[in-house]
């Protein structure tokens, strides 16, 4: 009789610890890096469009916090955001000149966990 009670106590304790962790720090259960970053460039207007896929139910708490743009390996733009405009897919536009031989690298960083980088190469 003692053995089944001990197992049930252990299982109950493990479930209780998991639920306490889940309730005390829920962001870890929702934290994920951006799933995708797509780049588009309009040479006429010299505008870089960065389309980011980052699913979040709490866009004011779990969002893409930084977007960093490097041109030929040198950081030229870093924008900091306090929320995400859409809970799944959204785009930002940046004025930046680029031409033949240039490379643009964009990194989107989650406010809680991880980042995703995309590169646009303009060839030689």
What annotation goes with each model-predicted range?
Residues 74-85, 121-123:
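Solvent-exposed serine/threonine-rich low-complexity stretches and specific carbohydrate-binding patches
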């Amino acid at each position: 009789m003692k053995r089944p009670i001990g197992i049930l106590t252990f299982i109950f304790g493990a479930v209780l610890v998991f639920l306490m962790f889940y309730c005390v720090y829920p962001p870890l259960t929702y934290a994920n890096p951006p799933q995708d970053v797509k780049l588009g460039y309009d040479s006429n207007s010299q505008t870089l469009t960065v389309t980011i896929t980052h699913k979040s139910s709490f866009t004011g708490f779990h969002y893409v916090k930084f977007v960093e743009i490097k041109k030929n390996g040198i950081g030229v733009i870093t924008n900091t955001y306090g929320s995400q405009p859409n809970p799944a897919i959204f785009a930002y536009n940046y004025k930046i000149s680029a031409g033949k031989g240039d490379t643009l690298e964009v990194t989107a960083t989650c406010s809680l966990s991880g980042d995703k980088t995309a590169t646009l190469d303009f060839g030689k």
